[in-house]
Amino acid sequence: MIGKIETLWDEIDNLNVNNSKELETLRIRFLGKKGEIASLMSGFRNVEANQKREIGQKLNSLKVKIQTKIDQLKETLGCQDLSENLIDLTRTAYPYRVGTRHPISIVQKRICNIFFKLGFSIAEGPEIEDDWHVFSALNFAFDHPARDMQDTFFIKYDKNILLRTHTSSVQIRTMEKTQPPIRILCPGRVYRNEAISARAHCFFHQVEAFYINRNVSFADLRQVLVFFAKEMFDSGINTRLRPSFFPFTEPSAEMDIMCNLCRGKGCSFCKFTGWVEILGCGMIDPNVLDNCNIDSKTYSGYALGMGVERITSLKYQVKDLRLFSENDIRFLRQFEMAV
C-alpha cells in the first residue's frame, strides 16, 4: 500500500487540466466514492496493526495533497475563464432593439386615463355575443340593416350568436347586474363585415362610456365631450355636434373635430369637408333602460362610443387604417417615443 501511495504522490505533482470538465474527471478519479482514496481507505482495514499509524499518516497527507492540487487547478482555470471573457470596452456598441407599445394600445390607454379623471371605471365583456346583448336589448328593430349578414359576422351553426359589432353589449351586461348610479368605460375589439380600405376594416377597437343617474342631461354629455376633445387633442381644438340617429340613444348626435391632417382645408381623409367624425353619442333611450330593469322615469343617462383607430389616425396623422394591423416594424418603430 505504501508503494501505491508514493506512486500517487508523485503523479499528483504532474497533474494538469485544460478545462472544468477535465478537472471534474480528475476529482472523481481521486476523491469520488469509487476513487483512488476510497479504494485505499477500504484496503486500510486489512493493514497490520504495527503499520497502521505510518500508513494512516501517509494516506491522510495524500488526501490533503490531492484536495490542495484540485483547488489550485480550479483557481487557475477561473483566472483563465475570466481573462477569456473580458469585455473589450473599445469595441463599437450596438443598441438593443427594445419592444414598444402598439399605437392603438397607446391611444386606448390615453382615452381610458382621460375618463378615469371623470370617475369612470372599466368593464369588459365577451367578443362572441348573442343577439339580445348586441341588438335586441339596445332597441334595434328586427329589420335593422345591422342584423343582416352583409354587416355582421354571425356564427355559422347558430344565428343567435355573433361577433359583437360594438362594445355597447358591455353596457347591457353591466346594467343587468348593477343599479344606478353607473359610470362605466368599455374598451375592446369589435367586428363588422366591411371591405378593408384606408378608412375601414373588418375589425377595430372601440371605447364606449356611459353614465346613468338621476337628472342626467344632454348638457352633462356635452361637457364631457368637450373635456375629452381638449384632453385628447389640443385645448384649442375646434369641435361640433351634428344631429344623428342611433337605435339606443334619443336624441343622438355625432361629434366632429377639425381635420388634423389638412387643418380644415379638405383632404381625402376628411372627404374634403375639413371635419372628421370621432364619436357617436346621445341620451340613452328609455326602452334600453327598461330592457335592463332600470326605471326610465327615475333615471336617465348618456352614452358615447368612439373608434380607437380613428382617434389614433388623427392624433398621429396616419392616413391609412390598414397600417395598424399589418405589423410593419418600420411603421411601428415610429411610435417608440409616443405618449
From Swiss-Prot:
Cofactor(s) of this protein:
Mg(2+)
Recorded superkingdom: Bacteria
Q: Which residues bind Mg(2+)?
A: 250
Matches recorded under InterPro entries: aa-tRNA-synth_II, aa-tRNA-synth_II/BPL/LPL, Phe-tRNA-synth_IIc_asu, Phe-tRNA_ligase_II_N, Phe_tRNA_ligase_alpha1_bac, Phenylalanyl-tRNA_Synthase, tRNA-bd_arm
Q: What is its EC number?
A: 6.1.1.20
Query: Where's it mainly located?
Result: cytoplasm
Where does this polypeptide localize? Cytoplasm
Catalytic activity, as annotated: tRNA(Phe) + L-phenylalanine + ATP = L-phenylalanyl-tRNA(Phe) + AMP + diphosphate + H(+)
Q: How is the cofactor bound?
A: Binds 2 magnesium ions per tetramer.
The top EC class is ligase
Which keywords describe this protein according to UniProt? Answer: Aminoacyl-tRNA synthetase, ATP-binding, Cytoplasm, Ligase, Magnesium, Metal-binding, Nucleotide-binding, Protein biosynthesis
Keyword Protein biosynthesis in the entry? The reply is: yes
GO biological process entries: phenylalanyl-tRNA aminoacylation
GO MF annotation list: ATP binding; magnesium ion binding; phenylalanine-tRNA ligase activity; tRNA binding
Under the heading PROSITE patterns, the entry gives: AA_TRNA_LIGASE_II (PS50862)
Q: Which GO terms describe its cellular component?
A: cytoplasm
This protein's assembly is summarised as: Tetramer of two alpha and two beta subunits.
Give the protein family. Answer: Belongs to the class-II aminoacyl-tRNA synthetase family. Phe-tRNA synthetase alpha subunit type 1 subfamily.
Q: Which NCBIfam families match?
A: pheS
The protein's name is Phenylalanine--tRNA ligase alpha subunit
